Regions:
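Single conserved hydrophobic/aromatic residue that forms the stacking wall/gate
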Residues: 195-204
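N-terminal helix-loop segment corresponding to the beta1-alpha1 unit
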Residues: 1-190, 195
Length: 204
């Protein structure tokens, strides 16, 4: 007799993951650990995490093994027209769509909320940006060290070290990724919102 082990509370939830580096992949890693069916979209070159950290096999670094676990990978180059139809079919069957692309680039790729919600009106759209979707900083890059500096964390850390320094961890990305995963889970309840925007600057 075989006993089927439950996959977790998010079993049956399909997540389309168009994220990269740390923040987004950490968020969707948590969703996968909760049992969600996470489909990770990668470019033909592969996600940057495939080349981050030690690796015994090319493209299978420690970064990929950690943040890519409990996920299925598919290659789409959304800059070419041929990828659009299969991408839209995926969206039409999804419960959650997550990305961490700046607003202007997201609009160019036609993955903004207005476009995605037309394909699946009840989809939970989670956009993790550095400084929000509007305002003077909306399209500025938001790597972890920039957010640590802009939020004052580097200055606070300097009170201990004697001069401003970055916390020795990708603190902003991990904190925001954790918050975003929690917000997505809350949004899966019918009474919650379906359009989530989480600027990293407010999470640290």
């Amino acid at each position: 007799m075989t006993t089927q082990i439950p996959r977790g509370p998010l079993q049956g939830v399909k997540v389309i993951d168009l994220t990269t580096v740390m923040l987004g992949p950490f968020c969707t890693q948590i969703l996968g650990e909760m049992g969600a069916d996470v489909i990770k979209i990668e470019t033909p070159e592969g996600d940057v995490n495939r080349w981050t950290g030690a690796a015994r096999s090319p493209g299978m670094s420690t970064g990929q093994l950690i943040k890519g676990r409990n996920k299925k990978s598919i290659i789409f180059n959304l800059k070419v027209p041929e990828a659009r139809a299969p991408f839209e079919k995926l969206i039409e069957t999804a419960d959650v769509f997550v990305h961490n692309i700046r607003p202007r680039a997201a609009a160019r790729l036609r993955i903004d909320y207005d476009t995605i919600s037309k394909l699946r009106p009840d989809i939970i759209y989670a956009s993790a940006t550095g400084f929000g979707e509007d305002g003077p900083y909306a399209d500025k890059p938001a790597y972890d060290d920039l957010i640590q500096a802009a939020s004052g964390i580097a200055s606070l850390y300097g009170r201990v070290t004697g001069s401003p320094k970055y916390a020795p961890s990708v603190m902003a990305d991990k904190t925001t990724g954790l918050f975003l995963s929690n917000y997505i889970v809350m949004a899966l309840f019918p009474v919650s919102y379906t359009h989530l925007t989480l600027p990293t600057i407010y999470s640290v």
